[in-house]
A protein has these predicted regions:
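Short hydrophobic/aromatic patches at helix-to-coil boundaries
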Residues: 2-3, 60-65
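Short alpha-helical DNA-recognition segment
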Residues: 17-32
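DNA major-groove recognition helix of helix-turn-helix/homeodomain DNA-binding modules
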Residues: 46-61
Length: 65
C-alpha cells in the first residue's frame, strides 16, 4: 500500500493539485485520501480506482510468472 500511496502523492504533486482538490474531484473523503497517500488503511477497490482515474492512472493485474 505504501508504494501506491507514493505514486498517488507524486502524481498529485506533478499535476499541482492539493489533497482537498483531489478528494473532491475523486469523490472520496479527505481523511481517506490522506490515509491512502500515507500508505495506511485498507481502502475499497472502488475508492482506489476513483483516485487513480482522477489522476490519469490505472491499475493493472498480471499473472505471476
Amino acid at each position: 500500500m505504501k508504494e501506491i500511496g507514493k505514486i498517488i502523492r507524486e502524481r498529485r504533486k506533478s499535476l499541482k493539485v492539493n489533497q482537498l482538490e483531489l478528494s473532491e474531484l475523486a469523490g472520496v473523503g479527505i481523511n481517506t485520501l490522506v490515509a491512502i497517500a500515507r500508505g495506511e488503511g485498507n481502502p475499497k477497490l472502488k475508492t482506489l480506482l476513483s483516485i487513480l482515474d482522477t489522476l490519469g492512472l490505472q491499475m493493472t493485474i498480471e499473472l505471476k510468472s
